[in-house]
Amino acid sequence: MSIRYLACASLGLMLTSCLKDSDILFPKDLRPNIELSLASSQKDVTLTLMSDKPESVFIDLNGNAQKDEGESFEVGKPVTIHPKGDKLGLYGPFTSMDISGQDVTKISGKGLIGLEAMNLTNTKLSTQEIEDALRLLAVKEGGKLTLEEWRVTPRIREHIKFYKWQIVRPNGSLIDPNESVLMLRALAKEVLEKRVALELEGGKGLWLDKNLNGTKDADEDLPTGGLTLNLPASLPTGESVYIIHGSATGLSLNVAEDPAEDESEEPEDSDEGADEAESTRALRANEDGSQIGISIDASRFSSLLSMECEEGLNVKHVDVSGCKSLATLTLSGNPIETLVLPPNGSELKVLQLAGNRLKTLDILDLTKLSQFTASNGTLEYIYSIPSELITLNLSGNKLTDLIIPSDSKLKTLNLKNNMLRNFKIEGEAYNGLETCILEGNQLEDLDLAAFVKTKLINVSNNPLKSIELPWDIKELNISKTELQGLNLNPKDTAHKSFIQKLDASNCAKLTLIQMSQCTNLSSVNLQGSKALKGDKISSELPQLTNLKGKLTIEQGRLSASELSAIKAKGWSL
């Protein structure tokens, strides 16, 4: 036996003899099985924990990861703790945890995996923190989560459903994940003075759960045609929640007019009056200047056929994932941050999202979508376009590339004012598109020859150096591009030119436009394109017979002989 072994063994015996019988030494880097983050270290915490190994559990009060004297507790009974910091470590295997009514802001740790029951009612946990905790929770089937219904988000509900857990209200009643329920949540810190008018069409069995107990009480029938919602921040999280049970085919939300304001005299024409009038059309901001955000959970309101939210309501979160029959969804003018759409097989045909705050969006599974507007937003990427789409307006976003599938039925495409560097069409010919607006992007080379039926193309305000065009285009705008030359004449005698209107203004490098055979051309704008000389203009303008053409150009750019030649061809300036 070596001297080194004997020395280590002796040291181990010395360390062991120094420990008290009541102490259990853990490694210094051992993390708690469950860690609770607290809103305040000055307030006592009362919790109830269950464990199938009660002798090995303790609450670490001093943060040394050791079971010291006074840190044991009796499982199954409430224990009150005086925390010494803003975190509380729970050690040992636990089967249930009740922290209801406590100022807990976050729960984490591998010990969540073994829980079979958890009560989180009336805590300061955000819905996001609960969702994060549930990623580890619910590994064992048949567990129970006690939580207020208004805090049960679609993600929480789906996670619990996947692991066959139950969600229980504080009063002990079960929350049916399949019950038709509409939930509206207003996120606000202060009491609001504005109201929202909610209208429901085709309603059946509608009632408003005023006291949030999950049971229909005597005065909770929903008035015919809808109701006006006041939005006081009455809940502990600073939220206002309305839970509507029943079913309806149509839902609309509008800013409710104040009856007192309607009866009052109209304000005088002044800035103060204008500001007051404006306040009637938008929800009032919080005192700190932040806007009220509305969240709509219609994921279980499966009977909906249409939903519309008025511009200015500040709707931020919408979930219609369970509304497979939904045909029209109008949310324009609201800063949508999250949107959960129905899965594949839905009936959604019209989607209006102008002014949203989304960065990415997947609409590929919306196989029946025909109209989609998401202009003036923050989209950076959009997944492939569904083939049934007819109208697409994504102007005013941050898109850098887009591919149009060859089987698309798209007729109108508006991508104005994006950041496009790449724009492609799958396949050799695309017969559907009639209008293509690519103005205000970063495109340098474009091949649009596959758009064989496109009538209007606008590629203005691009650093464009080359372009291939369809032969039967009628209107073309290439203003503010870097093109040096453009050929609009038919490529062969089998074709003829259909172009009627050309805007080639402010093209600093443009020196030649071949258009002498474009006999249908009746409007040409060359203003600001000073590199294009007068003799080239007079020689290339087509001879008009049955039409009269209009040429827009600065005075003094054409000589008298050039002017005479142009007028002789049927053109006026």
Placement of each model-derived feature along the sequence:
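Sec-dependent bacterial lipoprotein signal peptides
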Residues: 1-16
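Canonical leucine-rich repeat
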Residues: 107, 128, 133, 296, ...
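N-terminal capping/linker segments that flank leucine-rich repeat
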Residues: 18-306, 311-313, 324, 519, ...
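Leucine-rich repeat
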Residues: 93, 113-115, 139-144, 247, ...
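Conserved hydrophobic beta-strand positions in leucine-rich repeat
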Residues: 97, 118-120, 143-150, 251, ...
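Extracellular beta-strand/beta-solenoid scaffold signature
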Residues: 134, 292-294, 358, 399, ...
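Tandem-repeat architecture and repeat-register "anchor" residues
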Residues: 50, 110, 201, 299, ...
